[in-house]
Curated annotation (Swiss-Prot):
GO terms for cellular component: cytoplasm. ATP binds at S17, G18, G19, P20, D21, S22. GO terms for biological process: tRNA modification. Transmembrane segments: none annotated. This is tRNA(Ile)-lysidine synthase. It comes from Mesoplasma florum (strain ATCC 33453 / NBRC 100688 / NCTC 11704 / L1). It comes from the Bacteria. The N-terminal region contains the highly conserved SGGXDS motif, predicted to be a P-loop motif involved in ATP binding. Its EC number is 6.3.4.19. Keywords: ATP-binding, Cytoplasm, Ligase, Nucleotide-binding, tRNA processing. InterPro entries: Rossmann-like_a/b/a_fold (IPR014729), TilS/TtcA_N (IPR011063), tRNA_Ile_lys_synt (IPR012094), tRNA_Ile_lys_synt_N (IPR012795). Its main location: cytoplasm. The keyword Ligase applies. Coiled coil: none annotated.
Length: 398
């Protein structure tokens, strides 16, 4: 009898650690005549005996003629500055994305069970942070892949019983007993007999979330321009939870939600709070390799390296090729030609500096930028060119 339902005409990547849950799932999958299975295993070398996990998975795949992709990590964990669980999850899921591209398989099976669902809910309650979905969702996305959890209706006790009956080997991760991890503390005090009550609470909370998310979806769908989110009074008048959900939804729509996955809740809270209370027309919040920027009534996300200030001195015609670093390079060249190539010139997108020491249409550039409400996005991405002699900006800022 099939323990869970899957479309057997599809191909799947299967995340297998060697623990009881993933070994149970893999053992059940090979009974189902699925089109294609590719096993994915990550050895973090976090424990001295982690090679045993890898060996177990290798032997099982060899015995059952299964494709296996491995990622072996060599990391000095004494130098790891971020939370291990979040770091490991990113490593693991990015590996799935890589293997997904290699085999052209979109779906990844994860062996979360019914116990994990309840434990996750209790962790969410304890942390009191942003919750996208209470408990665990049957499906979710990470970058280009779909995460599928087919075992959320199966108890841990059922899994262990099945493994024993079928004589399937598995390993126990010793860190699962370490009480310094909050999930392990919760697990130690949980009884499967209480799960029905917890699941009823989870259902009720998720129904409330559905109503809120309908409103969030409506706002995002009706207030987007290209990949930017419009900020208006309707959003600013909402509570911080609604604004946070709106940010998440917007990033999800433009496929940039991976930027904030596993980030501390205070990052999104800070963005939401700025939207609600800040009267500034411009602010920037850095999130790793990306920045989220408020630009008048617009919110956009961009790679931080794309908006780094650059300044180039053009001493002669031979230096003109340097202007190609900027997206509006042709505009810059035409401006220099109109000025009869009266070298030297400065080309820069460092608007915080040039706005104070240059002139545009007879007024200080800072005043011009304010009066014309020139978008900060354009100031950062597009360069200006001015003569070092007159300090007059030669191209049109728009």
């Amino acid at each position: 009898m099939e323990r869970f339902k899957l479309n057997t005409t599809l191909s799947y990547l299967v995340a297998v650690s060697g623990g009881p849950d993933s070994m149970f799932m893999l053992n059940e999958l090979i009974k189902m005549n699925i089109k294609e299975i590719v096993v994915c295993h990550v050895n973090y070398n976090f424990r001295e005996d982690s090679w045993k996990d890898q060996k177990l998975v290798e032997d099982f795949c060899l015995k059952n003629n299964l494709k296996l992709e491995k990622l072996i990590i060599n990391q000095d964990y004494s130098k790891l500055k971020e939370n291990f669980e979040s770091w490991a999850r990113n490593i693991r899921y990015d590996f799935f994305v890589e293997i997904s591209k290699k085999y052209n398989i979109q779906n990844v099976l994860i062996a979360h069970n019914r116990n994990d669902l309840v434990e996750t809910f209790l962790l969410q309650q304890d942390r009191k942070g942003y919750v996208k979905h209470y408990g665990l969702n049957k499906t979710s996305t990470y970058k280009e892949i779909t995460i599928v959890r087919p075992m959320l209706n199966i108890l841990k006790s059922e899994i262990l019983k099945s493994l024993k009956e079928e004589n399937i080997a598995f390993v126990i991760d010793s860190t699962n007993e370490d009480k310094k991890y909050k999930r392990n503390k919760i697990r130690a005090n949980l009884s499967e007999s209480t799960f029905n009550d917890f699941e009823e609470t989870i259902k009720k909370l998720n129904k409330k979330l559905e109503i809120i998310n309908l409103e969030v979806n409506w706002y995002v769908n009706n207030n987007m321009s290209a990949d930017e989110l419009k900020i208006n009074k309707n959003l600013q008048d909402q509570d911080l939870e609604f604004i946070q959900r709106t940010i998440y939804k917007w990033l999800e729509v433009i496929k940039k939600d991976f930027v904030i996955q596993n980030r501390r809740n205070k990052t999104i809270f800070e963005i939401a709070k700025n939207i609600k209370v800040s009267e500034k027309v411009f602010w920037e919040i850095n999130i790793g390799e990306y920045s989220i920027i408020k630009d008048y009534e617009n919110l956009f996300i961009i790679e931080t390296k794309a908006i780094q200030p650059k300044t180039i001195l053009i001493k002669s015609k031979e230096d003109l090729y340097l202007s190609e670093e900027f997206i509006n390079w042709l505009d810059l060249l035409n401006a220099i030609k109109r000025n009869k190539e009266n070298y030297p010139y400065v080309i820069t997108n460092d608007f915080l500096t040039y706005k104070l020491n240059t002139y545009t249409f007879g007024k200080k550039t800072n005043r011009y930028l304010i009066d014309k409400k020139i978008r900060y996005k354009n100031r950062m991405l597009k360069a200006v060119v001015y003569s070092t002699k007159t300090k007059k900006i030669l191209n049109t800022i728009k």
